[in-house]
Design a protein with these regions (language model features):
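Outer-membrane beta-barrel proteins
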Residues: 81, 85-88, 158-164, 247-260
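Residues lining hydrophobic/aromatic ligand-binding pockets adjacent to catalytic sites
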Residues: 124, 131
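Exposed, low-structure sequence patches enriched in small/polar residues
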Residues: 32, 50, 54, 185-189, ...
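Bacterial N-terminal signal peptides that target proteins for export
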Residues: 1-10
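Beta-barrel outer-membrane channel/assembly domains of diderm bacteria
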Residues: 13, 21-114, 120-122, 136-155, ...
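Acidic/polar loop-and-plug regions of large Gram-negative outer-membrane beta-barrel proteins
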Residues: 204-215, 308-314
Length: 549
């Protein structure tokens, strides 16, 4: 084996050996292992696996001291769980770092995660459920010359599963808190933060040869620059964030290899006081897909992140049709309102009542009369399409939901939820038309004793399109402080008449948590923060173990 490849493999061992030598150092970490013993099931359309056991297993080790931190992650993904991209498969130590910090300076060498502003021009992060780890490997410095000022500079190559893309990603960021220099602002409980970012991608033009026809090749840019400017104002319970980012010409697979520039604008405001909260935000993005390799598709190699202005649903049927941010462009709006009716009032009753309202609405851009210029292949090698800033196209997604949480006694409480949803399956998945659904949910909890609690869910989805109506039921018995028993069934009472049943047993002890189960899972999208991964249907035994120290 190449000696260079041994270094990351030996780093965890070196960290463990070093612990007793340096008594002032602390060792922390975590273990996560998710296992599936798959079984074929033609009724739900499972994918056959030649492997008897599938697992995603991670071991994180971090060594900390007063001035120096170091860490590494071992990943065993040689037989991964279903639904990940082919290159996800492998094993080794792909993530390791050393970090030094002294007074107002922090220096990192190795693999690191970073975000500038809202992530419009740079966000590297790990999300294991989606198979995302787009860390940069290189160097980063964070410097705070005075109170209220933070400077960052970085460079590196981005991870793509078990390799790193060739493009060099570099950037810088500055944030200034004006209240540190204008004392009148702080005296009036006002905070104003100004921020600015710049990111550069240096990608060799011969990395991907893109031909318009048999004899004409695109002259691809070697450098792509992106910048971001933002201001965040808070006054008491009021907050306002305005942010704008722009990207130079960046022909890629995502945008159909056109040479138009990209931009995104966001305005977000919120207000909160005791018993009430309000959030209003809007975002317009156009051509802001930004990857460290232009020919990539799927979930890998993103340098930036465009958050989805949609509510993260936790109930099974409400999360049936999640929305993923459209990288080529969209208008997105979101409004949230929360209110707590006081105890002793007509609506609050003896124990109080909580009300939550959410509205999410996403529309496409108006592409000068062309429904989808990227899909129909008209714009390769051109300057892109024309799109008026305020003009909107068809509806991509919409959900309106109302949730009421009511306690009827010291031992019994209920959550009621209604959700109306529109999901443009043709735009999001490429087929299926507009899916319209209405969802009713009841979630009740009864405490038999301080240790024994029963929670039950009943859900029904009236759905026009796709597979029709769905029903869901769940019973969860918690026996504190260690045990939890769960049974559930999701039934398609529309087209397929198929049941997706599950039974789970969970045991927790201090920092250990182990869960064993058996059942079916329905095929669908797993989404987080506007990024989605398709997960095929599965059936079999599952085992999960989590431990942190």
């Amino acid at each position: 084996m190449n000696p260079k490849k041994l270094i990351p493999l030996l780093l965890p061992v070196m960290l463990l050996v070093a612990t007793p030598v340096f008594a002032q150092m602390t060792l922390s970490g975590s273990v996560q292992s998710d296992i599936l013993v798959p079984q074929d099931d033609d009724k739900i359309g499972t994918e056959h696996s030649d492997d008897k056991v599938l697992t995603n297993t991670y071991l994180d080790l971090n060594l900390g001291s007063k001035y120096v931190d170091a860490g590494a992650r071992f990943e065993f993904l040689k037989y991964p769980l279903p639904g990940y991209e082919p290159d996800f498969k492998g094993w080794g130590v792909p993530h390791f770092y050393v970090k030094g910090h002294y007074k107002n300076v922090e220096l990192t060498a190795g693999d690191y995660y970073e975000q500038f502003g809202s992530g419009f021009v740079l966000r590297t992060y790990e999300e294991r459920s989606l198979g995302i780890d787009n860390a940069l490997r290189g160097g980063r410095i964070v410097y705070k010359p005075v109170s209220g000022v933070t400077l960052k500079a970085l460079t590196g190559k981005q991870r793509r599963y078990w390799h790193h893309n060739d493009a060099l990603v570099s950037g810088a960021d500055i944030e200034v808190g004006l209240e540190q220099f204008i004392k009148a602002l702080e005296a009036h409980d006002t905070h104003i933060t100004l921020g600015g970012s710049w990111v550069n991608k240096h990608e060799k033009t011969n990395a991907d040869a893109i031909f318009v026809d048999a004899t004409h090749k695109l002259n691809l840019p070697k450098y792509v620059n992106a910048w971001d400017a933002r201001v965040n104002v808070t006054y008491g319970g009021f907050s306002l964030l305005a942010e704008y980012a722009q990207k130079t010409q960046d022909p890629s697979f995502d945008n159909g290899y056109h040479f138009g520039k990209g931009n995104v604008a966001m305005l977000s405001t919120s207000y909160s006081q005791k018993g009430m909260s309000v959030l209003l935000q809007a975002k317009r993005s156009e051509g802001m897909s930004f990857r460290s390799r232009r020919s990539m598709s799927g979930t890998s190699s993103y340098i930036n992140h465009l958050p989805a202005f949609t509510h993260d649903q936790t109930y099974a049927l409400a999360a049936q049709y999640p929305y993923a941010t459209n990288p080529n462009g969209e208008w997105a709006f979101q409004a949230e309102f929360g209110y707590s009716f006081k105890k002793g009032t007509t609506l609050g009753g003896k124990y109080g009542t909580k009300l939550k309202f959410n509205l999410s609405h996403v529309r496409g851009l108006d592409y000068d009369g062309v429904k989808d210029p990227v899909a129909d292949g008209r714009i390769i090698g051109s300057n892109g399409y024309k799109s008026s800033f305020f003009k909107m196209g068809e509806t991509y997604y919409q959900d309106i939901d109302v949730q009421i949480e009511k306690r009827f006694s010291r031992d019994f409480s209920l959550i009621f939820m209604y959700m109306n949803e529109r999901y443009n399956m043709t735009v999001i998945e490429g087929h299926g038309g507009m899916i319209k659904s209405n969802i009713l949910i009841a979630d009740g909890k009864y405490k038999f004793s301080p240790k024994l609690t029963l929670r039950c869910e009943l859900q029904y989805q009236f759905c026009k399109g796709d597979d029709g109506d769905w029903a869901f039921g769940l019973a969860e018995l918690s026996w504190a402080p260690h045990w939890m028993f769960t049974v559930s069934d999701m039934w398609n009472c529309g087209e397929t008449k198929v049941h997706y049943y599950q039974a789970l047993v969970t045991y927790s002890l201090k920092s250990h948590r182990i869960q064993a189960g058996y059942g079916r899972t329905c095929a669908g999208f797993n989404c987080s923060g506007g990024v989605c991964r398709w997960v095929p249907a599965t059936r079999g035994f599952t085992l999960s173990y989590n431990y942190s120290f």
